[in-house]
UniProtKB/Swiss-Prot annotation:
It comes from Bordetella parapertussis (strain 12822 / ATCC BAA-587 / NCTC 13253). Keywords: Dioxygenase, Iron, Metal-binding, Oxidoreductase, Phenylalanine catabolism, Tyrosine catabolism. The active site is at H286 (proton acceptor). Homogentisate binds at Y344, H365. This is Homogentisate 1,2-dioxygenase. Fe cation binds at H329, E335, H365. It catalyses: homogentisate + O2 = 4-maleylacetoacetate + H(+). It is an enzyme of class 1 (oxidoreductase). InterPro entries: HgmA_C (IPR046451), HgmA_N (IPR046452), Homogentis_dOase (IPR005708), Homogentis_dOase_bac (IPR022950), RmlC-like_jellyroll (IPR014710), RmlC_Cupin_sf (IPR011051). HAMAP family: Homogentis_dioxygen (MF_00334). GO terms for biological process: L-phenylalanine catabolic process; tyrosine catabolic process. Involved in the catabolism of homogentisate (2,5-dihydroxyphenylacetate or 2,5-OH-PhAc), a central intermediate in the degradation of phenylalanine and tyrosine. Catalyzes the oxidative ring cleavage of the aromatic ring of homogentisate to yield maleylacetoacetate. Pathway: Amino-acid degradation; L-phenylalanine degradation; acetoacetate and fumarate from L-phenylalanine: step 4/6. The keyword ATP-binding does not apply.
Amino acid sequence: MSLQYQTGFGNACATEALPGALPAGRNSPQICPYGLYAEQLSGTAFTAPRAENRRSWLYRIRPGVQHLPFAPFAGAQRWLSDFGRQPVTPNQLRWSPLPMPDAPTDFIDGMHTWGGNGGPEEQSGVGIHLYAANRSMQGRFFYNADGEMLIVPQQGRLRLATELGLIDIEPYEIAVVPRGVRLRVELLDDVARGYMLENFGTAMRLPELGPIGSNCLANARDFQIPVAWYEDVEGDFELIAKFTGGFWRAPIAHSPLNVVAWHGTHAPYKYDLRNFNTVGSISYDHPDPSIFTVLTSPSDTPGTANMDFAIFPPRILAMENTFRPPWFHRNIASEFMGLIHGVYDAKAEGFAPGGASLHNCMSGHGPDADTFEKASHADTSQAHYIRDTMAFMFETRRVIRPTAQALASPQRQDDYYQCWQGLQKHFDPEQA
């Protein structure tokens, strides 16, 4: 089925699956249309500034409070929120893609935490995860009280059946599910693999554009929000909650995806990365990678993000007398990269779609030896067309602490450092 969407990042939306289900003129009437319950879902404090306030009013068949008590849940064993306090290696790290599971595995049980920082109780930091699944969630629903979830598919399409409507995403698209929104993740293909970032901090937003002006990068009009959809289903289900880093399970006798109408600003959304309006230099030098930012979560320090989500999409390089690939770099921020499709222009070999790399604070990184040699002798009088690629980066202000399971993973490339060992010494004090 072809899904319908509303458009516009951060818009105050209003949608109903049955005519007249949205109360007119008030949020909480004495009796709601169709015998529905009114429930507010708050994503920010009541007193948050209006421009940053996130809340939605839901009109649902049964209220969200109706379920049996929670008890600890034994699943999701590889989805972690405790990133430890042990010293972190400064070595550059890289991993090959996760293999697809052999046993039946859904989105929740197929999540593998690769690293993170901060935590849900601090309301700051991130969790970074890879997922690999081969079946839809069956008889279970999930919500994350710890943070919003940024889902980046690399292989296989997903349907996110949420309280506020349906979202379909495929590779090259992303979705963000706000804190607390209940959902069921369905596979639209036989298998699915990708990346997921948990943002424990301030909700993601579009970056400020500064001198770029009022257009470019990710344009607000291209973000899509679901329309109201509901299912009125009863049965023996389980509601799984992620709360303060732990997982909990509550029996529930009906589907919680029973919101017939809603209005507000706290809602899931999707975005097609192919719509990103890339900017760059048309004279010389490679600008800072902040020009590729899609979404950002601000911190309490102006100009310094809790986390940024940036992409490296197809683009045209026109800079003359310039080393065009991303330059060698040591950064106060920490960078986790993934590859959705193709080849990343700074790494000719070893970085495969579905793989990942981690370059932490002040750990050197940059193009491998082969890329450096080719770019150093390229004809920069001609434009270079980078096609058939899509890489991305999760950048955080804090050090990303890799988990023990990531460090011990058979997908870890222990020889990653070798890609720079072939860089030659070209220094000649007699020749400028």
